[in-house]
Amino acid sequence: MKNTQAPSAMPIHKYRPFHEQIAVDLPDRTWPAKRIAVAPRWCAVDLRDGNQALIDPMSPERKRIMFDLLVRMGYKEIEVGFPSASQTDFDFVRSLIEENAIPDDVTIQVLTQAREHLIKRTYDSLVGAKRAIVHLYNSTSVLQREVVFRSDRQGIVDIALAGARLCRQFEALAPGTEIYYEYSPESYTGTELEFAADICNQALEVFEPTPERKVIINLPATVEMATPNVYADSIEWMSRHLNHRENVILSLHPHNDRGTAVAAAELGYLAGADRIEGCLFGNGERTGNVDLVTLGVNLFTQGIDPQIDFSDIDHIKRTVEHCNQLPVGERSPWGGDLVFTAFSGSHQDAIKKGFEAMAARAQRESVDVDDLVWAVPYLPIDPKDLGRSYEAVIRVNSQSGKGGVAYLLKSDHALDLPRKLQIEFSGVVQAKTDAEGGEVTSNEIWAIFQDEYLPAPETESDAKWGRFELGSTSTANENGDHVTLTVTLRDGETVSKATGEGNGPIAAFFDILNARGINVHLYDYSQHTLSASESATAAAYVEVNVDGRRLWGVGIDADTTTASFKAVISAVNRSVRASASSVPAELAGV
């Protein structure tokens, strides 16, 4: 078949290939023949490199939540800030130290430029810390030297060495703190290799690495400029040319400008690196830092312990989304909502047969399925190992069916359902159509939706919609986030007032329900108005766990808070109805 592609009109004359900018020549490379057998040392830089790239940088509270998450997951080296750059970062580092929040086996890392007042301020922030890495950096690339610093190589070396000497000089400002050093030739990928090795080796002479006090040399792809194999070649070349190599921890810091940061990190690790810096789910400037979740779970899929706990990936994702105020993509490797979902009928059939084959083999060998080597088509990992269920994997409805239902609800009724609620409701529609057959119109879909999620108006139904019905509501004694809530609530045939407390209206409402023996836990919440007018009605959606059932509820009201209460009641009533009909928890609402 003839290739009919044609030249584009794009201005390719503006760009030069990487090999014409920086020479990386390693014909005797050895890394392609190597295999990864053990996890690298990890350093999470979410609190600095990730935080600086956020539209809304983390508050101290969100920073602490992120730090605690990283500690629980098992990260032992955590970059916590640039204390000389802002009072916020300085205060956060101090709070971690003064509140004894840093476990004995965790080392914090702080960033500084090579300036005297910044380095002194950095050491001031570390007073009282048991152990810390001082991360010194200055930019070394050809472009930065010419455009930003207007300096020759020696001028850049002088900056690095002056900074390194000041670091050693100011160690006395943090007595009792074990100080370790990291040096980064920033914009390393745009730096000539021989110059990168020279400036790193001169910095090493100042830092004086020993077996007990190794020095980290960090080689950042500050901007990803070439294919991952080129980065790996440069890492192997540097590993061969660094002095005191046995006392150097060679570290990688890939960015994702070309979309290949994970591959660059994995190949760079094969090429001789010992350590990798990155962020959870790849947050960071521009297209982000390398994704530590992808790197870690990739190791796990190969039977290599990542030495990091990813067993509750949804909690990790929700926490990161809260701290970063940015969503994790639905197809983000291992953590996205859709990564284990098959819409293709042939894929679903293969997955189903894979599960059946695993079960049959376990029975033949008289072992538990979890004791077998995982082997299911289209699923490179058991979703349960990341805390996921099989519910989304084995559902029968097609993508078009789900999309069509969601489109009609949005276009005809202005309801913009969250994706996971779309999936749940498409199962409800499928169950109805399987039982009754025939074409499903927009009006019929709306009727099914009302019957499942919304209380029918008294004029349209004589039947009780559910156990609970909301009356009036009021909040009082608001002190910061603390709320005391009073509601009028119908519980069966009884109408009474009830009071609850919590760190917000929904938490206070959960307190009221808990007092009635209903155990409710929130997973997800969203809301929107049904029109653009000032008096618009609001729709609220909640995903909750009600006494072991994970399901959605929907509430519609002129008041957004009341809409959220109604959504919770919707979910609770659905759970009660499912219990009464003995529907299994994972099929509640279907």
Swiss-Prot record:
Domain (Pyruvate carboxyltransferase): residue spans on this chain: 40-314
Name by which UniProt lists this protein: 2-isopropylmalate synthase
GO molecular-function terms, A-Z: 2-isopropylmalate synthase activity; acetyl-CoA C-acetyltransferase activity; magnesium ion binding
Region (Regulatory domain): 456-590
GO biological processes: L-leucine biosynthetic process
Pathway: Amino-acid biosynthesis; L-leucine biosynthesis; L-leucine from 3-methyl-2-oxobutanoate: step 1/4
GO cellular-component term (any): cytoplasm
Main location: cytoplasm
Organism name: Leifsonia xyli subsp. xyli (strain CTCB07)
Catalysis performed (reactions): 3-methyl-2-oxobutanoate + acetyl-CoA + H2O = (2S)-2-isopropylmalate + CoA + H(+)
InterPro entries (UniProt xref): 2-isopropylmalate_synth_dimer, AIPM/Hcit_synth_CS, Aldolase_TIM, IPM_Synthase, LeuA-like_post-cat, LeuA_allosteric_dom_sf, LeuA_N_DRE-TIM, PYR_CT
Residues at which Mg(2+) binds: 49, 253, 255, 289
Domain of life per record: Bacteria
